[in-house]
Structures are given as structure tokens and as C-alpha cells.
């Protein structure tokens, strides 16, 4: 509502003309930031007023009070202590509020000196905090990026441009994305905030981003993305004369980069970050994993959105924050280039072959700091002495890490390792700068003082000496004056009216002969004096704290500017340390969990021997149980495995396991298997599980069909598709028909690798006429009414699903199970002979499913039946029933 008002209407609503000067100042700033919650600094508190106060009180759970009246209207107010601001910001950001921080730009004393005792302290917004522009450690996850993204859709709509930046680490990237892959790319990045043109507010894209991905969108007017404006912003930001300095980029990429930089400028005010030139990447360099597949495979989060139980949590044994973020990025973006994959695998293999080095490096890495985020805080004037000390300690540790390599290999390191550790040599100039200037006990807050070493600057030493030894200097001056006057009872005292003064008894007044003693006050029994020397000392003592803090801030800013000059090197060092952490992590888990180096080919191989699901395996190990490994042998000649078998037997685990092995392999890690030979996978798609999407008004079946449709539309020959129970949620005939046609399409049109699990046993006959499709099932052992799931994948087809056994295991009442057995028996009797012939009996009307009778299958069934018959033990009635049964088989 407020956003739709003009300035005059706003002033009228809030009785602006009769408001106090301070409240007018608040309203002026609020009117300029109507889309934000305004936190207004007043002394030791950040206050909120009017509607902001009511909203913040509810969200933060803090008391709502009043600050007098504005005209006839009472002013609602609430506040939070300035030192606890981050705690409250966390809640506001989690609730997706945009927060404007309004600070005091001068002290009350400075305001009085400027405009008298009625002067209002100057205030202004120093930054606007949004989910995508956070840099505070306490407000963002340490082990994952915090992206702000700008999405620009050109008029042809074939290719979109996406620029994303992590302000906390100064990473900035731009990429062109096919229009059909926009949601998948956003799912990969998981940006905290997306900038989008107002013209797209009602588009299907915006609807999908919000409803399917649940990402925050910040809309901007269309002119925000104007090409000429964005080009100028880029040139000014990077101090370039030609846009080609960025590289070969399209017009829409210019708009994406420029709009991101403009948004950072608007939110960060004067503290614009020092960002490197945007890195231009190729969308096809990374494996495509759509948002539903990421959810189904639980790659970086589990189904509830937490990291616990995800693939990331299983593989993450990194020991640094930046290493954790790099692993997160690796898992989100598996490679598709064989050379780059093998390069990573060679690094992993080197460390796997040098586990003693790995052990030493991991211990040393624990002593390093997150210098990426330290550097960002320094460049944005939000750092503390602790950040500089963190850089110093990390530089020191980096050189020790390099010595570990040198001690083991001398100058004979492989080139790919030498390249990683090159930045570890350190920077003596930078190290010495910090070592000589910053105290080891430097506080977090610059306003506390005590950051700069005393010996670095003589004035700092002098001021601290005054602060620490002020009383001693007063005592020395007192002793001096006693000697000069001969008055042993002379004292130097203090009160709030005249400050420091020399105090003597009235009877000694005749001894004060030197004119330097200036009379200040006479009481009944005492006379008080001062001197120029005492006044100077008093002034120095009173101002020492303020002066030293001001001087230290000035010196600190100069030191930070020198550190910023080393930003490129520090980013390389951070990259080196995070890379070491990730590859040592890969070597560690390969050794700890018996992983093997995969081999990559350029064909359709997917040959996994004794593969395991890493997450399930780890969960079973906690229960002292073993995981049952399985093979998977897909190839050009056997591209599709049709898997049938009982519920709870492990079909879904097997499907997920192989998709996960492909992902792990293509990030450069060893994999949970005895051996693995993989043709590079360009895209992974999964259709696993069932859930109604009530928010979008979609049934389970509709959601499934939409996902399946997207898979068939986007897959290529090099993709890996895993499908579980396609076609359920509708009638049996409809479901079988859909599953059948999907399988045919994958086999004949896409010709890609596919694992297809189903309870439609009718589909198994497709192996008779689809040469690249083979039947597999899950081995079980039956003992009377009991079954044992062996979890082994074996060649063949299941003829039943054992649903009643699973129902019994789930605890259904025995009477229900018994009744279900009776009904099942009746169904089986009335449908004997129809089961796998349902489709073929309809074949005259549906040519899609027309099958030639399979004599081999019939013969095998007859053989199986005859092998169980003992003619000598058949009664006449049993023999007659057998004849009818055999006739149905034929």
C-alpha cells in the first residue's frame, strides 16, 4: 500500500509537518526505502517505528512499545541492542525480509558542535541487507555458497543469460543457458535471491521459480536491465574503456552482469566490493541434473531440505570451510569433459597413493582460516583485526604445507600437483605487514581500540601510555609541584566541575609564588590552582582514548588497503587450500570406505562391478550391518535394464546408487565399487517416488507425467535415465500402456542408458522384441509364507510383487492379511492365463502392443510346470484340473 503512495500522501499519512525533527529525519529516510524494514540507530539501539515496529515485534518476538504521538496518532516502537543486531537479522533474513540499516554518521558531541544543542545527529542508510547480499559469518552457511543471481531473457527467448555472485567470497560468474534449462541451472546454483524484470512477473518462468524451486525473486523495472546502462556500469566498476575487457560476451550477458553490479551498489552503498572480472563458463561443461532429480537423489540436501543424510554429508570430510564450499560446488556441478574429469582423478589418485602426506596436510589445513570471506570483509570495510590475523596465520601454515610436499618429493612433484601448491610459497611482504602492525589480542570491534601494536607507531605508543599510566603521570606531576613549592600536603584532585586541579590548604597559600600556578577556586579551608602543564595533561588524558581509536582506525584502513592490493594472490591461495582440502578428502574417503578409481570412455558403457550406495552403506555401518553390493552392466548393446521384483527388495536403492556413482565419478572422486567403467553422462534424470503436489494442484499421476514428459524431451543419447514405477496412479491398463510406450521411446528414439523399475510384470515380454532391453529382478528366498530379501540384482523377471508379505511386515492385522490372501487367490484364479497376455489379447486393436506369440516362453513355462508334477500321485480330479491349467498356458 505504501509503495503506491506519492510523497505528499505519505507525509499526510504520518503527520510529517507536526513531527519532531528526529522523527522527520526518520520519515525522510523511510520514504526513500519503503520496500525495506528500516532499523534506525539511536544510541545503543536500533529502533523501528510505525508498521515496521508492529511487524518486527511479531517476527522477532520483542516487546512493542510507543514513542509518544505524532499528531493524534501514537507511534508504535520496538528496538534491539546494536551489539546483538546479527542475532535479530538472522530471523528477518530467514523470513525473507529486506532490511535497511540506518546508522549514526556522527557522534552527539559532533552534532552539537555543528548545530548547537538542538541539532539532530546525522543519519543515513549504510547498507541494505537482502538474502543474496549477506557477508556476515553468522548469517550465512559456512559450507555452501550464498548466491545473488540476475536472470535476463532476450527477445528471442532461445538462450537466457545468468550472472551470479557470492558477495561473501567475491566469486562472480556469467553463463548462457538454453531456455529449456533455466530451472535446472537455477536448481544447480540454489541462489538465495534472483533479480528478474518486472515484465516477467506474470510469466510461467517466474511462477515456476517461485512454486517449483521456492526461490526468492526480487523484481526490478525493465530499465534496470537496459543494455547501455549496464555496459556503462561494468566499464565504471572495472575501470575499463572497452567491454571486450570482460571477454566475448553477449548483450544479454552484459545486462546480467551490469544489473548484478548495480544491485550491489544500491544495497552496499559506499562499501562496494572488489570483485574480479566475471568468469565466463559454458553451460554444457557440467552435467545437467534437473531440480526433481536433485531432490530425488538427495545430493546436497535430504528430502526435508537438511544436509543430514544427503550425499554431501556422506562425502564431506573436509576440514576447512572453503573446502566444504568447493565440495558443495563439485557435487552440484559434475564435469562432462573427459580430460577435465581425468585431471581431477589423477590428483585424487596422487593423494590416495600418498596417504601419509594426506594425514599431515589435513592436520595443517585445520589451522588455516576462511580467507576468502576474510578478504571480502576487508574490501568492504567490515573487517576486524581478527581477519588480518587469520590471513597471517594462514600464510604461515601454507608455507609449512608446501614443505610437506618438498620433504616427500623434492622437486619431482607431478606438474598438476605443482600447479595446485604454487601459491603456498606465501608472501613475505604481506605476512610481515600484518605481523608488524596487528596485535595478537586484537579485539573484534575497532571501536574498542587496542588493534595496532604500540611499537608500529610512536603516537599510538604515547597515547596508550597515557591511557595505561595516566595516574602515574599525575603522581609525578604532584611530586614535582611539592618539590617546587615545598608543600608536602599538596594534592592533585579531580571533580566534574573544574576537572583536574592542584589542591593546597589555605595556610600554605603564601608558598605559591610561581605565576605558572593559576588560581581556580577558593573554599573555606582550601585553595585550588591549575597550570598549563596540568591542563595539557588533562586534555591528553581525556582525549587519549578517542585519539588512539581514531588513529588506529586510520592506520588500520591503510593496512587494509595494502592487503587489498594482494587480493589476487589471496584468492589464488584460498583456491589452492580449498582444492587441497577437497582432493585430500577424496583420498581419505577412498581409503576409509574402499572406493576405486573409475575409468572413463566416450561410448555408452556403464559397467559397475560390486557397486554400493554410499549413503545407505554408511547408515547400515552405524547399525553394524553390511550393504549388499550389485553390478550394473549397461552398454550400447544392452542400454535398458527392466527391473521387476518385490517391494522393499532394493530396486529404488539400486537405481539411485548407479546415478550417484556417475555423479561421484564425474566430480573427480573415486567411487563405491570394485571397478567402474563409465561413458561420460551429460544429463541424469530420475522419476522416483510419488507425492501429490497440492500447492500446484497436481495429483501424483499428473506430477509424474510432467516429470516423465520433461525427461523424454530433454534427454540425449549420452544421458542416464532412472525411472521407478512409471504409470502408477491410474488404471492398470492405462499405466501399463504408458510405461510400455515410454520404454519403447527410450529404446528406439533416445537410445540412451536407462534403469527402469516396475511392478508391471507384463512389460517383461518387451525383451523379446527390443534388443537393447534386458530383464533383471531382485533375488529372494521363500520359506512357506515367509520371504527373505537378498537384495541381489539377477538376470530374469519376477512374476509377483510379494505385496502381502510387505503388508504383513508393516503390521497390518492378521485378519486383513488373511482376507487379502483369499482375494488375491481369487484374482489369480480368475485371471490365470491373462496376466502376461493382457496386452497381447488387445493387440488386434492396439498395434503398438502387437506381439508374436513367444513359443520359447510358453515352452519354458510348460517345462517348469511338468518338472513339479508326479503323475503317480495325481488323483483323477487333480489330473483333470491340470489339463485345464496346461491348456491356458498354451
From Swiss-Prot:
Pfam families with a match to the protein in the record? MutS_I, MutS_II, MutS_III, MutS_IV, MutS_V
Task: Give the signal peptide as a residue range, or say none if absent.
Answer: none
Domain of life, per UniProt, equals: Bacteria
SMART domains of this UniProt entry? MUTSac, MUTSd
Q: Which UniProt keywords apply?
A: ATP-binding, DNA damage, DNA repair, DNA-binding, Nucleotide-binding
List where the protein spans the membrane.
none
State any GO BP term from the record: mismatch repair
InterPro entries hit by this protein: DNA_mismatch_repair_MutS, DNA_mismatch_repair_MutS-lik_N, DNA_mismatch_repair_MutS/MSH, DNA_mismatch_repair_MutS_C, DNA_mismatch_repair_MutS_clamp, DNA_mismatch_repair_MutS_core, DNA_mismatch_repair_MutS_N, DNA_mismatch_repair_MutS_sf
User: Where along the chain is ATP bound?
Assistant: 645-652
Q: Which GO terms describe its molecular function?
A: ATP binding; ATP-dependent DNA damage sensor activity; damaged DNA binding; mismatched DNA binding
Which protein family is named in the record?
Belongs to the DNA mismatch repair MutS family.
HAMAP family noted in UniProt: MutS
UniProt function note:
This protein is involved in the repair of mismatches in DNA. It is possible that it carries out the mismatch recognition step. This protein has a weak ATPase activity.
The record's annotation in NCBIfam families points to: mutS1 (TIGR01070), PRK05399.1 (NF003810)
The protein depicted here goes by the name DNA mismatch repair protein MutS
Primary gene name: mutS
Amino acid at each position: 500500500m505504501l509503495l503506491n503512495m506519492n510523497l505528499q500522501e505519505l507525509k499526510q499519512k504520518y503527520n510529517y509537518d507536526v513531527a519532531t525533527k528526529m522523527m522527520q529525519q526518520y520519515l525522510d529516510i523511510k520514504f526513500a526505502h519503503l520496500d525495506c524494514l528500516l532499523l534506525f540507530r539511536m544510541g545503543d539501539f536500533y529502533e523501528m517505528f510505525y508498521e515496521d515496529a508492529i511487524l518486527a515485534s511479531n517476527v522477532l518476538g520483542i516487546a512493542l512499545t510507543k514513542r509518544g504521538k505524532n499528531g493524534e496518532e501514537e507511534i508504535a516502537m520496538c528496538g534491539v541492542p546494536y551489539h546483538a543486531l546479527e542475532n535479530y537479522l538472522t530471523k528477518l533474513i530467514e523470513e525473507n525480509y529486506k532490511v535497511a540499516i540506518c546508522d549514526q554518521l556522527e557522534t552527539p558531541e559532533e552534532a552539537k558542535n555543528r548545530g548547537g544543542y538542538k541539532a539532530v545527529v546525522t543519519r543515513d542508510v549504510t547498507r541494505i541487507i537482502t538474502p543474496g547480499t549477506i557477508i556476515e559469518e553468522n548469517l550465512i552457511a559456512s559450507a555452501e555458497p550464498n548466491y545473488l543471481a540476475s536472470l535476463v531473457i532476450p527477445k528471442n527467448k532461445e538462450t537466457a543469460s545468468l550472472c551470479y555472485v557470492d558477495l561473501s567470497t567475491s566469486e562472480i560468474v556469467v553463463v548462457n543457458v538454453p531456455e529449456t534449462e533455466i530451472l535446472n541451472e537455477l536448481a544447480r546454483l540454489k541462489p538465495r535471491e534472483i533479480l528478474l524484470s518486472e515484465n516477467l512477473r506474470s510469466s510461467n518462468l517466474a511462477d515456476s521459480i517461485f512454486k517449483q524451486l521456492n526461490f526468492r525473486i526480487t523484481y526490478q523495472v525493465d530499465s534496470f536491465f537496459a543494455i547501455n546502462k549496464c555496459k556503462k556500469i561494468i566499464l565504471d566498476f572495472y575501470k575499463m574503456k572497452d567491454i571486450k575487457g570482460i571477454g566475448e560476451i553477449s548483450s544479454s550477458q552484459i545486462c546480467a552482469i551490469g544489473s548484478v553490479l548495480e544491485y550491489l551498489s544500491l544495497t552496499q552503498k559506499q562499501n562496494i566490493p572488489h570483485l574480479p572480472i566475471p568468469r565466463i563458463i559454458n553451460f554444457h561443461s557440467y552435467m545437467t541434473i534437473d531440480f526433481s532429480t536433485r531432490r530425488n537423489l538427495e545430493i546436497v540436501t535430504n528430502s526435508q531440505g537438511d544436509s543430514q543424510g544427503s550425499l554431501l554429508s556422506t562425502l564431506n570430510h573436509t576440514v576447512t570451510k572453503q573446502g566444504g564450499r568447493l565440495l558443495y560446488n563439485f557435487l552440484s556441478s559434475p564435469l562432462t569433459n573427459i580430460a577435465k574429469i581425468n585431471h581431477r582423478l589423477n590428483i585424487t589418485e596422487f593423494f590416495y597413493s600418498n596417504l601419509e602426506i594426506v594425514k599431515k596436510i589435513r592436520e595443517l589445513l585445520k589451522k588455516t582460516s576462511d580467507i576468502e570471506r576474510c578478504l571480502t570483509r576487508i574490501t568492504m570495510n567490515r573487517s576486524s583485526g581478527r581477519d588480518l590475523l587469520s590471513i597471517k596465520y594462514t600464510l604461515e601454515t601454507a608455507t609449512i604445507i608446501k614443505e610437506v610436499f618438498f620433504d616427500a618429493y623434492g622437486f619431482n612433484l607431478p606438474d598438476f600437483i605443482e600447479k595446485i601448491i604454487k601459491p603456498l610459497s606465501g608472501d613475505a611482504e604481506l605476512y610481515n605487514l600484518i605481523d608488524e602492525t596487528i596485535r595478537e589480542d586484537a579485539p573484534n570491534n575497532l571501536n574498542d581500540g587496542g588493534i595496532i601494536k604500540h611499537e608500529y607507531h610512536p603516537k599510538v605508543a604515547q597515547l596508550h601510555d597515557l591511557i595505561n599510566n595516566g595516574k602515574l603521570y599525575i603522581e609525578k606531576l604532584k611530586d614535582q609541584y611539592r618539590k617546587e613549592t615545598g608543600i608536602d600536603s599538596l594534592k592533585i584532585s579531580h571533580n566534574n566541575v573544574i576537572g583536574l586541579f592542584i589542591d593546597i590548604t589555605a595556610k600554605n597559600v603564601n608558598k605559591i609564588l610561581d605565576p605558572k600556578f593559576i588560581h581556580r577556586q577558593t573554599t573555606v579551608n582550601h585553595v585550588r590552582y591549575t597550570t598549563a602543564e596540568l591542563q595539557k595533561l588533562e586534555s591528553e588524558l581525556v582525549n587519549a582514548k578517542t585519539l588512539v581509536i581514531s588513529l588506529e582506525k586510520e592506520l588500520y584502513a591503510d593496512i587494509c588497503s595494502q592487503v587489498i592490493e594482494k587480493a589476487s594472490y589471496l584468492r589464488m591461495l584460498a583456491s589452492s587450500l580449498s582444492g587441497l582440502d577437497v582432493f585430500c578428502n577424496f583420498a581419505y574417503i577412498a581409503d576409509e570406505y574402499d572406493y576405486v578409481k573409475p575409468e572413463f570412455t566416450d561410448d555408452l558403457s556403464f559397467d559397475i562391478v560390486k557397486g554400493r550406495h554410499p549413503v545407505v552403506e554408511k547408515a547400515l555401518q552405524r547399525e553394524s550391518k553390511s550393504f549388499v553390493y550389485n553390478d550394473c552392466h549397461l552398454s550400447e548393446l544392452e542400454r535398458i535394464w527392466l527391473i521387476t521384483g518385490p517391494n522393499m527388495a532394493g530396486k529404488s536403492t539400486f537405481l539411485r546408487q548407479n546415478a550417484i556413482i556417475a555423479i561421484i565419478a564425474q566430480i573427480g572422486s573415486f567411487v563405491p565399487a570394485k571397478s567402474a567403467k563409465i561413458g561420460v553422462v551429460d544429463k541424469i534424470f530420475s522419476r522416483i517416488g510419488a507425492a501429490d503436489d497440492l500447492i500446484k494442484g497436481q495429483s501424483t499421476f499428473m506430477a509424474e507425467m510432467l516429470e516423465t514428459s520433461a525427461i523424454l524431451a530433454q534427454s540425449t543419447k549420452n544421458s542416464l535415465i532412472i525411472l521407478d514405477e512409471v504409470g502408477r496412479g491410474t488404471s492398470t491398463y492405462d499405466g501399463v500402456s504408458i510405461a510400455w510406450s515410454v520404454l519403447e521411446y527410450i529404446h528406439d528414439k533416445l537410445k540412451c542408458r536407462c534403469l527402469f523399475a516396475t511392478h508391471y510384470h507384463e512389460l517383461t515380454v518387451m525383451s523379446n522384441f527390443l534388443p537393447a532391453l534386458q530383464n533383471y529382478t531382485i533375488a529372494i528366498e521363500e520359506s512357506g509364507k515367509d520371504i527373505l530379501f537378498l537384495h541381489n540384482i539377477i538376470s530374469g523377471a519376477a512374476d509377483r510383487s510379494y505385496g502381502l508379505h510387505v503388508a504383513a511386515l508393516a503390521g497390518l492385522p492378521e485378519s486383513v492379511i488373511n482376507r487379502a490372501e483369499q482375494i488375491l487367490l481369487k484374482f489369480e484364479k480368475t485371471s490365470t492365463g491373462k496376466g502376461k497376455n493382457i496386452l497381447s489379447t488387445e493387440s488386434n486393436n492396439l498395434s503398438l502392443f502387437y506381439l508374436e506369440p513367444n513359443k520359447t516362453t510358453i515352452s519354458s513355462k510348460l517345462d517348469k510346470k511338468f518338472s513339479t508334477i508326479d503323475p503317480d500321485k495325481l488323483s483323477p480330479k487333480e489330473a483333470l484340473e491340470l489339463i485345464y491349467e496346461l491348456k491356458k498356458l498354451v
